[in-house]
Amino acid sequence: MQLCIALDLPSQEENLKLLESLVGLPVWIKVGLRSYIRDGKEFLGRIRQIDPRFELFLDLKLHDIPNTMGDAAEEIASLGVGMFTLHASSGGEAMREVAARLARFPRRPLAFAVTALTSFGEEGFREIYNASLESKALDMAMLAAQNGMDGVVCSVFESQRIKSYVAQDFLTLTPGIRPFGEPSGDQKRVADLHEAKSASSDFIVVGRPVYKHPRPREAVEKILEGIA
């Protein structure tokens, strides 16, 4: 299991200060919409300057027509990031196009398809998809696997079911991790480290429990110890 730290602080300066406290730790750094829109691709270079060993995860959750998604995937791959996200609900054709574009790169990023955001509960999910969250997440995961994606973004509670349904080596990336029993906030489907390990999550994402901790490095070290 690998750890991704979400950079969700209000300013670039605060995010960089957080990163400076984590130098030398074996973590992925997740750059989401807020940071990328505000700070641009130059921000990725600043992260690398702080510690070139940080692995970069660009979490933009692409969702568009196939050609546009393919173009975006090529641009993302050219940035040299290690992984990125798109929505499985963009469809099989769009995911096939992304996979085909990525195949042009000798060293390409991992592509993860989002099934159901962890902010969804069952009721909210049904309002949009008119289906149960678990069954639809399984179907989306299979669609993603059949169309060239490396894995899916899902909650811990779907992770092992998806692996059993698709393949044990199909990757799962699970947000909504509350390692020290923190409040769930705007997330509906949250889990602790033990649950993530039991569900065979390949990557976990932790944000607020790290950057709101008075000693972020200590928090990350404890998480790394817990998933070792």
Curated annotation (Swiss-Prot):
What is a biological process (GO) this protein takes part in?
'de novo' pyrimidine nucleobase biosynthetic process
Arranged from A to Z, the UniProt key words for this protein are:
Decarboxylase, Lyase, Pyrimidine biosynthesis
Q: What are its E.C. numbers?
A: 4.1.1.23
| Entries under Gene3D superfamilies matching the protein | Aldolase class I
Does Lyase show up as a keyword for this record?
A: yes
Top-level class of the enzyme under EC nomenclature: lyase
* Domain of life where this protein originates: Bacteria
What does UniProt give as GO cellular component? cytosol
Give the pathway listed in the UniProt entry for this protein.
Answer: Pyrimidine metabolism; UMP biosynthesis via de novo pathway; UMP from orotate: step 2/2
Please list the residues that make up the active site. Answer: K61
What molecular functions are annotated in GO for this chain? orotidine-5'-phosphate decarboxylase activity
Q: Where does substrate bind?
A: 8, 30, 59-68, 118, 178, 187, 207-208
What reaction does this enzyme carry out catalytically?
orotidine 5'-phosphate + H(+) = UMP + CO2
Query: What InterPro entries does the entry give?
Result: Aldolase_TIM (IPR013785), OMPdecase (IPR014732), OMPdecase_AS (IPR018089), OMPdecase_bac (IPR047596), OMPdeCOase_dom (IPR001754), RibuloseP-bd_barrel (IPR011060)
SMART domains for this protein: OMPdecase (SM00934)
Tell me the CDD domains matching this sequence: OMP_decarboxylase_like
Role according to the record: Catalyzes the decarboxylation of orotidine 5'-monophosphate (OMP) to uridine 5'-monophosphate (UMP).
Q: Which family does it belong to?
A: Belongs to the OMP decarboxylase family. Type 1 subfamily.
Assembly, in brief, is: Homodimer.
Q: What's this protein's name? A: Orotidine 5'-phosphate decarboxylase
Task: Supply the source organism's classification.
Answer: Bacteria, Pseudomonadati, Campylobacterota, Epsilonproteobacteria, Campylobacterales
Name the gene that codes for it.
pyrF
